[in-house]
């Protein structure tokens, strides 16, 4: 480490090892598990999977041990589990996944903050789960273990039989690779090359993934990280292991040849909301949602599994909440997390958060706070009450408006469904009503305030079109329910906000993955169009006349210095705006008032009339002397961006020096073209110059309205989604608006419509029943406690149910905030009758904390 420093930069180096000591032993243990090899007789042969694919009844399958290992990482919210994943990904070659899209994107955001990271898939995508498996009839077959306690082979067979409808389809699809010429031979070619070059086996296997980019991730590594694993049902543990062995047996990978086994690193909290499983009974037209044992509880509580996995030596517990800065509140959350005894002191602290239930349910109170409820019905009721209140309150900021959402039902497949499901008398309206939660996002369908559906039959296209109007609130906080394409076309915030965007590379990181040139070109466009905001600010009459004159002089001098660096102005020249030459051939400005000029004689252009009324000082020389061209090469693009960025930062410094915070917090808007609004509708002449990006569930958005402006990048959506031509034709006729969202940084974007296929499975029939088209957003003003898990919310007001209280739900709800100052509750759940639904998991956790073999990370 250098001890010297120059005048510009300090050369001292600081290394952060604060968390490394606790994580180092985890890395060592995971590496040991991953490097352990099996004898040949323990490796599941390819013939096992070929034979399994021929069985119609999975109960007849041979009970076989599918070897695997698990390292468990548990802990409460904000304790450092994600940081541990980041360290593991940096040091080990591993496959990182999440249980849901939100979990995957959360961990992606964590990784991409430090370095460039590929997108993180869900564990379902990695093991081969497809869209047509969503409607699979799980549990169609059942296997009863013959011994008590059951052996590991029996536990695995029980899970495989339960999940066989999905695993059977995945197995048959994977075995088709054997029939292709290059499928399983991809690694054989590399092995031949290793033999020719005299290299050890596996030395060049990494080249395979560079040559064949479409290889399944399971062929690359045997270390699989699953974030938020507590949301997975227990049978998925074996399903993942089964698919790993299947994939590697088919491709004959180096790790399969070496006898390596899959190592699952399960990360999460076993004491939060339960894993849920849903099935649809066509005979009763009813969707059944039931609680199932999650993977973490299964691993911790099942004695056979604990012994097989040697859990005590393969378990790390993170026990400190680093998000919460209040020790007393953090202690309360820890008590709820681990099921520790609740004291009177804890109860008295919770008393401080209690307010009347009517106070929380009144939309006039706690504006901007997120309401959490136990049921979707309560959420829907509050949203209706909120919308009614806003309609009559006269609030100009939070305005209520409605947008149409559509469902296109295939009449032919609907008739086939009625026959297959033995429902000859079911109507379209009834079918739509009972399947609302399956057609779109479950929470979205239950929570939103929507009108009664209206149906229209179009016999020529063979379609029934269902339409309902959904109510939204302008300027409210929303989240997208799935990953959607968006077209970023502007910025709306403050000067200070935009400066932070320029100083921080986060925008370039998140939007420059495809081509960084697009991101720089877009920012240059906003910089050029938004530079006039500095001069607009100076038009305020409340500003000091002397400060305004000084600002005009300094802005003009700065602009000329940057645009014409070869023109060396003396210090005296820089003091007077009159010394700066405005090119008259570009501007034609006379500098006289309109009243002094004969308009008909002196002006041929209306713009000249307008500008002649301005004082010379009001003219931004940038627009007179610089033509914003379309830079082509990378160097030209960055040079243009660098020049405009330098000018913006220079102007910002001048204005802050003269006007302070009053300027920096003033509004700064810039768009790729002229933008105006009327009510909730936004008008923009042309979207050209914007850039394509993705709207993620992990981002926070503000609903700014809607627009009918055409976005060319979205025109191929029906083709990309493989929507039937007649549906695409009708969708085009309806001309659905595009919603406009502002992200947490201030960037404005038009978000593509959320278009999805709905495929119904009835016995052995797969029917393409419907196509849905909505906006893919849900409000953050109110949601269920279960939906809030994993979200960080600034201000929360909770309405607990008065009966059936579960401490796991109480913990999830209360731990959404980082400060107890922004927490309100209708009751004190610690003083009410409550229960635990965690299968005595707390006792196991407390025992683990006392176990010297379990690794504790503070």
Swiss-Prot record:
<dbReference type="GO" id="GO:0005524">
    <property type="term" value="F:ATP binding"/>
</dbReference>
<keyword id="KW-1048">Host nucleus</keyword>
<protein>
    <recommendedName>
        <fullName>DNA replication helicase</fullName>
        <ecNumber>3.6.4.-</ecNumber>
    </recommendedName>
</protein>
<keyword id="KW-0067">ATP-binding</keyword>
<keyword id="KW-0235">DNA replication</keyword>
<dbReference type="GO" id="GO:0016787">
    <property type="term" value="F:hydrolase activity"/>
</dbReference>
<dbReference type="InterPro" id="IPR027417">
    <property type="entry name" value="P-loop_NTPase"/>
</dbReference>
<dbReference type="Pfam" id="PF02689">
    <property type="entry name" value="Herpes_Helicase"/>
</dbReference>
<dbReference type="GO" id="GO:0004386">
    <property type="term" value="F:helicase activity"/>
</dbReference>
<keyword id="KW-0378">Hydrolase</keyword>
<keyword id="KW-0347">Helicase</keyword>
<comment type="similarity">
    <text>Belongs to the herpesviridae helicase family.</text>
</comment>
<dbReference type="GO" id="GO:0042025">
    <property type="term" value="C:host cell nucleus"/>
</dbReference>
<feature type="binding site">
    <location>
        <begin position="75"/>
        <end position="82"/>
    </location>
    <ligand>
        <name>ATP</name>
    </ligand>
</feature>
<keyword id="KW-0547">Nucleotide-binding</keyword>
<comment type="subunit">
    <text>Associates with the primase and the primase-associated factor to form the helicase-primase complex.</text>
</comment>
<dbReference type="GO" id="GO:0006260">
    <property type="term" value="P:DNA replication"/>
</dbReference>
<dbReference type="InterPro" id="IPR003840">
    <property type="entry name" value="DNA_helicase_dom"/>
</dbReference>
<comment type="function">
    <text>Component of the helicase/primase complex. Unwinds the DNA at the replication forks and generates single-stranded DNA for both leading and lagging strand synthesis. The primase synthesizes short RNA primers on the lagging strand that the polymerase elongates using dNTPs. Possesses helicase-like motifs and therefore may act as the helicase subunit of the complex.</text>
</comment>
<dbReference type="InterPro" id="IPR034711">
    <property type="entry name" value="HSV_HELI"/>
</dbReference>
């Amino acid at each position: 480490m250098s001890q010297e420093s120059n005048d510009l930069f300090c050369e001292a180096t600081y290394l952060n090892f604060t968390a490394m000591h606790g994580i180092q032993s985890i890395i060592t243990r995971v590496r040991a598990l991953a490097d352990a090899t099996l004898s040949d007789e323990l490796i599941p042969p390819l013939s096992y999977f070929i034979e399994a694919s021929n069985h119609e009844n999975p109960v007849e399958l041979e009970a076989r041990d599918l070897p695997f290992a698990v390292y468990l990482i548990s802990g409460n919210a904000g304790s450092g589990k994600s940081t541990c994943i980041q360290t593991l990904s940096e040091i080990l070659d591993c496959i990182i996944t999440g249980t849901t899209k939100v979990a995957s994107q959360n961990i992606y955001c964590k990784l991409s903050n430090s370095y460039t990271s590929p997108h993180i898939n869900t564990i379902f995508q990695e093991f081969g789960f497809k869209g047509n498996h969503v409607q699979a009839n799980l549990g169609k077959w059942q296997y009863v273990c013959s011994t008590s306690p059951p052996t590991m082979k029996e536990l695995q067979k029980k899970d495989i039989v339960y999940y066989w409808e999905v695993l059977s389809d995945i197995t048959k699809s994977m075995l088709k690779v054997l029939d292709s010429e290059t499928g399983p031979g991809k690694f054989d070619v590399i092995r031949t090359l290793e033999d020719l070059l005299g290299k050890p086996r596996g030395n060049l296997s990494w080249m395979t993934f560079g040559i064949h980019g479409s290889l399944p991730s399971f062929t690359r590594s045997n270390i699989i990280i699953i974030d938020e694993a507590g949301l997975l049902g227990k049978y998925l543990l074996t399903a993942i292991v089964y698919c790993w062995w299947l994939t590697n047996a088919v491709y004959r990978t180096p790790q399969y040849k070496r006898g390596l086994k899959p190592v699952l690193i399960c990360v999460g909290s076993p004491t939060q909301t339960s894993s849920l499983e849903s099935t649809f009974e066509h005979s009763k037209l009813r969707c059944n949602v039931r609680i199932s044992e999650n993977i973490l509880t299964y691993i911790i509580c099942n004695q056979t599994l604990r012994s097989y996995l040697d859990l005590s030596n393969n378990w790390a517990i993170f026990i400190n909440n680093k998000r919460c800065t209040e020790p007393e509140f953090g202690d309360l959350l820890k008590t709820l997390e681990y099921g520790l005894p609740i004291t009177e002191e804890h109860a008295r602290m919770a008393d401080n958060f209690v307010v009347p239930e009517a106070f929380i349910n009144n939309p006039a109170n706690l504006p901007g706070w997120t309401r959490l409820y136990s049921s979707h019905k309560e959420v829907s009721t509050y949203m209706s009450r909120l919308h009614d209140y806003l309609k009559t309150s006269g609030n100009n900021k939070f305005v209520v408006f409605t947008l149409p959402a559509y469902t296109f039902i295939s009449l032919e497949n609907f008739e086939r469904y009625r026959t297959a499901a033995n429902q000859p008398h079911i109507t379209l309206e009834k079918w739509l009503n009972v399947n609302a939660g399956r057609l779109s996002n479950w929470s979205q369908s239950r929570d939103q305030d929507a009108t009664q559906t209206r149906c229209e039959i179009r016999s020529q296209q063979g379609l029934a079109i269902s339409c309902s109007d959904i109510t939204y609130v302008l300027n409210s906080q929303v989240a997208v329910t799935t990953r959607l394409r968006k077209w970023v076309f502007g910025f709306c915030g403050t000067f200070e906000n935009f400066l932070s965007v320029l100083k921080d590379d986060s925008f370039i990181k998140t939007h420059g993955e495809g081509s960084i040139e697009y991101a720089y070109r877009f920012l240059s466009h906003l910089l050029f169009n938004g530079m006039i905001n500095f001069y607009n600010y100076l038009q305020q009459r409340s500003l000091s006349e002397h400060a305004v004159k000084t600002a005009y002089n300094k802005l003009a001098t700065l602009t000329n210095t940057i645009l014409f660096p070869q023109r060396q102005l003396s210090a005296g020249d820089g003091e007077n705006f009159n010394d700066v030459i405005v090119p008259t051939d570009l501007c034609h400005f006379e500098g006289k008032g309109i009243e002094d000029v004969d308009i008909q004689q002196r002006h041929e252009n209306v713009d000249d009339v307008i500008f002649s009324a301005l004082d010379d000082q009001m003219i931004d020389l940038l627009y007179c002397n610089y033509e914003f061209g379309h830079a082509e090469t990378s160097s030209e693009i960055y040079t243009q961006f660098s020049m405009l960025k330098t000018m913006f930062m220079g102007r910002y410094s001048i204005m802050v020096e003269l006007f302070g915070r009053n300027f920096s917090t003033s509004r700064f808007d810039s768009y790729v073209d002229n933008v105006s609004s009327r009510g909730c509708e936004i008008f923009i002449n042309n979207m050209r110059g914007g850039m394509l990006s993705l709207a993620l569930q992990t981002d926070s958005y503000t609903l700014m309205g809607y627009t009918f402006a055409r976005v060319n990048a979205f025109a191929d959506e029906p083709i990309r989604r493989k929507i039937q031509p007649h549906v695409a034709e009708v969708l085009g006729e309806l001309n659905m608006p595009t919603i406009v969202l502002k992200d947490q940084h201030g960037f404005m974007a038009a978000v593509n419509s959320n278009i999805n296929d709905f495929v119904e499975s009835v016995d052995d029939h797969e029917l393409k029943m419907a196509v849905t088209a909505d906006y893919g957003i849900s409000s953050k003003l109110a949601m269920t406690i279960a939906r809030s898990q994993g979200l960080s919310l600034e201000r929360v007001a909770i309405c607990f149910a008065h009966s059936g209280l579960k401490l796991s739900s109480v913990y999830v709800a209360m731990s959404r905030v980082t400060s107890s100052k922004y927490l309100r509750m209708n009751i004190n759940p610690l003083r009410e009758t409550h229960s635990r639904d965690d299968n005595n998991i707390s006792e196991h956790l407390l025992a683990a904390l006392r176990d010297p073999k379990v690794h504790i990370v503070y």
